[in-house]
Amino acid sequence: MKKLFVLNGGAAVKPGNKSAFLKIDDPLSSFSRGGINTGDVLVYDAMLKALAYDQIKNLQFAHAGDEKLWPQEDYDATVIRGSNYLTETVDISNVIPLLKKLKGPIVPVGVGAQAAKYKKLELPKGSVEAWKIIADKCETIGVRGVYSAEVFNDIGIKNVRIIGCPSFYRNLRPSIEIRPIDPAKARVGLTLNRYLSADYASNATKTNRMQRALIQAVAQRPVNRLYSQGEREETLAIFAKGEEKQKHIQSILEKYNLDGDKDVEALVSDRMQAFFDVDEWAADAKENVDVLVGFRLHGNVIGLHQGIPAVFFTYDSRIRELSTLFAIPSVEVEDYMPINLENIFEKADFSKVQHVYRLNYAEYHRFLTENGLNHVLANPVTAPPKKALEKPNLVQTDQNLGEVTDWFQDEVGYMTGEIQTLRDRAWKLELALRELKAPKPNAKLAS
């Protein structure tokens, strides 16, 4: 019997050990406490599909300090589910005692760095120590792209292999065929990220304004749909009823300054979906969308691995790194231009994606094999790449001068209003502080 120990899997596993899902009986109760990133579940699901083990035990990083939860028997291998572990705020030092105790290989699959921009990261000392222990216990660490490899190199870890994210290979096939797009009639699937800040976006203002414009563009087609990737308000809006549902819908509209936009309200109210089972999520995308767009990494990958074309809107190192590695067409939010979906779909070049996928698949196959993991991947149809891609496949659209002028006039008007709002708030705060500092009349009498 082959046994696999998983660190930070983050989901339940179906019988047969090939599918992951979130076991949520009461979505309203669960999501009232906060959002749950279902993209992480997709990564775990893809790993399960690629690996072949009879017994699987998972332990989350958050509970790794509890020795009572440590495995009491030896496992053939340990894998770490890929995620954004390489940041200046994520400290995994609590996992060090467990890492030292575990026998056999410890193989991270799809580790990535996350920052607003490509830059040198100052990782927590505990994380550096943990990654060096892991590096000594595997042949190679699987990383998402060139930037993540550079971050490891900066802390002295050289044994890395650039594989992307395992979710891209969920279909287990050595090649994919991207479907053609009919720009005028394509059914569009959209994902959003409501919690972008300066820590995770090179320009949070541009990113959120671009999301607003994209929502409006997608909402204009009644066949289009919105996927919640575990966002709190979105998921609550799907499962709540009556006034409670309307309250969450209103919160979403206000977040993007779209209160009163009936098209967007209809999209959010009637055509928004959420899935806790990855198999069901993938099946819905396959049946109901022709192209995916948006601001969530795995919201696009759920289609891409099935041959459904997708266009990324890139705003941080993570999205830029992975879209570049697979030559996926992308719109850079820093360019900050008006959104015309038909124009984007017409200009998006997917000609490289199929070729690059075959190369990256071969690298993933080599990575799993060299680390001694028991896997079911078919043999590659080509050799791995000599060098990972580093140049993004940006969508170059033809902009109408009138549309661009109107766009920037509206944006300047919005920004001006926001500045005035901030000034008003600052003035009210100043008045309140003055009032607090002013001597009280009763105090003078008492003295």
Segments (PLM) and residue ranges:
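Active-site anion-handling motifs in enzyme catalytic cores
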Residues: 1-447
